[in-house]
Amino acid sequence: MSESPAQEARTRTALVLYGSETGNAQEVAEELGALAERLHFVTHVAEMNSVKATLLTILPQEMLRSFTFTIFVVSTTGQGEIPANARSFWRSLLLKKLPPTFLSGVNYVSFGLGDSSYPKFNWAARKLHKRLLQLGANEIYPRGEANAQHPEGLEGTFIPWITDFRSHLLDKYPLPEGLHPIPDDEQLPPKWVLRLQEPATTGDELTEGTLSSEQTVSDEYPGLTRLDHDVRPIPDALTATLVENRRVTPRTHWQDVRQISLTVPDAVTYAPGDMICITPKNFDEDVQALIDMMGWGEMADKLVSLAPGEKLQAAGELHAPPIPGLEKYPKLTLRALLMDYIDIRAIPRRSFFSAIAHYTSNEMHKERLLEFTNPEYLDEFWDYTSRPRRSILEVLHEFHSVKIPWQHVTTVFPVFRGRQFSIASGGELKRTSGGGAKFELLIAIVKYQTVIKRIREGVCTRYLSVLRPGSTLKVQLQRGGLSSSVNQLVGPTVLIGPGTGVAPLRSMLWEKAAFVKAYREEHPDANPPIGPTILLYGGRNRAADFFFEEEWQELSDLIGLQVFTAFSRDQRHKIYVQDIIRRNFGLFFRLLHDMNGSVYICGSSGRMPQAVREALIEAFEHGGQADGPQLARRGAEEYLIGMEKSGRYKQETW
């Protein structure tokens, strides 16, 4: 007896594994998972570390080989590194005992997310791709690479790639006769749904810890949704207190830059180059606007919980909830969820338009929403979303017929991803008088106007800009890409940091100063064994954005810091940090070539790091003494590449 099309389709399976630092790779993985579902593959989407090393090394056939194919989606972090939620999986692939046939029979495709302003563009995806091939896996479709520097962002390369990939899957794995792809205008079952919390069970007393589903918590616990009081159970987070939020640029300056100081009571340790990750919150007026538009008023302040949808209830542990730790949130209401977790001011992806098209009965609105999901209308999609930076809240206001069920909030809307900020404090600035840890940040408040003449604000910096001293917020301490050894830190160093890019470099300088002070205390009659230190700082105007100017003289006395500045608007001809390098070829050749020094570059991605790289290559080419070593162009490029490989050339840009 032959199988029915539905029975035959159940043998089609797909696994989508992602490694994501900021959430972009996870969003791409979810979109690829939805694509596979629409082609009738039973699909699982999970972070790479969820495939435990024991499963991978002991039961490979039951895991990776059991799927028709596996899609690996990975972003590159730091200096070509694998994201934290994929590292244990990656390390398990590097075991020396694995034979070259270990992954034979595993069909895979990979997609990487990177930034071409970094020397190691998409390094993580390329490393993973190469290792999978070494272990015998079979690539079923050419890997894709997204570039954050694309004019349309990551989707500029992802959308054409996924469109062609869909056609390839239909050719390679044709659907059983009588079965057709699930069309975009047909809704997929939600993976996770919100539900009213169960009323208190009989015999239980109603205390502060248990409220029935008919009660609201807005009056009883007003602090839960306060912007300046953070109760979110974010995994691996510290509860920090904001002690300073000071504007360091003049009121007349075009940019609002803040020096923000946070403290925690414990003596947490961190190193120069490390980062603080802050998850933003929404403003009450924005949340109320969404509640009003959707008609969620009656539900807004009732207790809710997140539960797996019908398809996930028996799917096993691979499917992690979209918001880790949410079950520990005290008194979770729909309003609290929207305030603390849902990114309603994000620029929508194509998948958002596909999702909300199912929640309107207005045929004109539905047709237009689905047009935005069609690859043939990519330019219109970008003209409507990324180019004017139009937010989800604005889209829903314009497509006012869309009414999303509150139960589907986490399926339709993106969740907040933490924003990373380089720590600016180091050495003696890292500790409070009470022995706790202190984190100082230098943050530019994002606020600008787009082609549709509306003011745009960064979601996280808008949140930070209004926090007052005494506010609490949950922060995650993360390793950064500028980490260095002690020898590198105290050796010859060139630090290049225009604008707020100077933040992690300040941390390095104060760390070097702490080393010098400690050495002098132990060896009062000896000079500290430190190399020359040069800071290249760039800004618009010396009077407006020369951050930490008063500290550089103190550091000059302590560690011999030499500061070069490039203020682009203080004279008729613009000057940038790369111009300083070109004026001092001999100096940079001596420090970085003759003395084997290290260079650290931090600031905006795009033209600056590329221009600095080119200027350094020119310094290696032309900066040598007439009677000393000379490098041709090829040799200069190879020398800089060698610096990268040995960790003497590091870049952190955004």
UniProtKB/Swiss-Prot annotation:
One of its GO terms (molecular function) is oxidoreductase activity. NADPH-dependent reductase which is a central component of the cytosolic iron-sulfur (Fe-S) protein assembly (CIA) machinery. Transfers electrons from NADPH via its FAD and FMN prosthetic groups to the [2Fe-2S] cluster of dre2, another key component of the CIA machinery. In turn, this reduced cluster provides electrons for assembly of cytosolic iron-sulfur cluster proteins. Positively controls H(2)O(2)-induced cell death. PROSITE patterns: FAD_FR, FLAVODOXIN_LIKE. SUPFAM superfamilies: Ferredoxin reductase-like, C-terminal NADP-linked domain, Flavoproteins, Riboflavin synthase domain-like. GO terms for biological process: cellular response to oxidative stress; iron-sulfur cluster assembly; nitric oxide biosynthetic process; positive regulation of nitric oxide biosynthetic process. NADP(+) binds at residues 500, 568-569, 574-578. Residues 235-485 form the FAD-binding FR-type domain. Residues 14-166 form the Flavodoxin-like domain. Belongs to the NADPH-dependent diflavin oxidoreductase NDOR1 family. In the N-terminal section; belongs to the flavodoxin family. Its main location: cytoplasm. FMN binds at residues 20-25, 75-78, 113-122. Coiled coil: none annotated. It is an enzyme of class 1 (oxidoreductase). Its EC number is 1.18.1.-. Keywords: Cytoplasm, FAD, Flavoprotein, FMN, Mitochondrion, NADP, Oxidoreductase. InterPro entries: CysJ-like_FAD-binding, FAD-bd_FR_type, Flavdoxin-like, Flavodoxin/NO_synth, Flavoprot_Pyr_Nucl_cyt_Rdtase, Flavoprotein-like_sf, FNR_nucleotide-bd, NADPH_Cyt_P450_Rdtase_alpha. Its cofactor is FAD; FMN. It is found in: Cytoplasm; Mitochondrion. Interacts with dre2; as part of the cytosolic iron-sulfur (Fe-S) protein assembly (CIA) machinery. FAD binds at residues 389, 419-422, 458-461, 654. It catalyses: 2 oxidized [2Fe-2S]-[protein] + NADPH = 2 reduced [2Fe-2S]-[protein] + NADP(+) + H(+). This is NADPH-dependent diflavin oxidoreductase 1.
